[in-house]
């Protein structure tokens, strides 16, 4: 069975907590990503998604100079490089996330996206299940 380290993206664009939302959004546009890890001295501190920007910045009347630390999601779900793709898929489905940061001794070493799992033959069923669970989130 393939492990996360064989599939994860290791060249991950990141931002620091003290960068501005405008800088983060520009970096997200440049790399064509909907989420970016927030890292300080190699340690994963949070994730910033396009949804975070829309709901916690724009919708609240804040401007682009708002620090990432005030907008990022800090309740993190992460995986480790040695976990199986099956386990990563299940974790993503359970927490309804499309991107799973991969950490080793608290340091960000990569990221696995739902699309990465979908292209791996061994986890196609799990990726489909994860996508189904993410797409059918419970309304609260």
UniProtKB/Swiss-Prot annotation:
Q: Output the PROSITE patterns linked to this UniProt entry.
A: CBS
- Source organism's superkingdom? Bacteria
Q: Name one Pfam family in it.
A: CBS
Show where the CBS domain sits. 8-64, 72-127
Q: Which SUPFAM superfamilies match?
A: CBS-domain pair
Q: What are the entry keywords? A: CBS domain, Repeat
Q: Mind telling me what this protein is named?
A: CBS domain-containing protein YhcV
The source organism is Bacillus subtilis (strain 168)
Gene name of the record? yhcV
């Amino acid at each position: 069975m393939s492990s996360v380290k064989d599939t994860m993206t290791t060249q991950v664009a990141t931002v620091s907590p003290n960068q501005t939302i405008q800088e983060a959004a520009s970096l997200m546009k440049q790399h064509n990503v909907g989420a970016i890890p927030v890292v300080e001295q190699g340690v994963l501190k949070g994730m910033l998604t396009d949804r975070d920007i829309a709901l916690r910045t724009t919708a609240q009347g804040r401007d682009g100079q708002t620090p990432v630390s005030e907008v990022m999601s800090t309740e993190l779900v992460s995986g480790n490089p040695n976990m199986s793709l099956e386990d990563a898929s299940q974790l993503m489905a359970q927490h309804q996330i499309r991107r799973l940061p991969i950490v080793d001794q608290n340091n960000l070493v990569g990221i696995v996206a739902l699309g990465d799992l979908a292209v791996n033959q061994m986890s196609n069923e799990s990726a489909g299940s994860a996508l189904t669970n993410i797409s059918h989130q419970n309304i609260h």
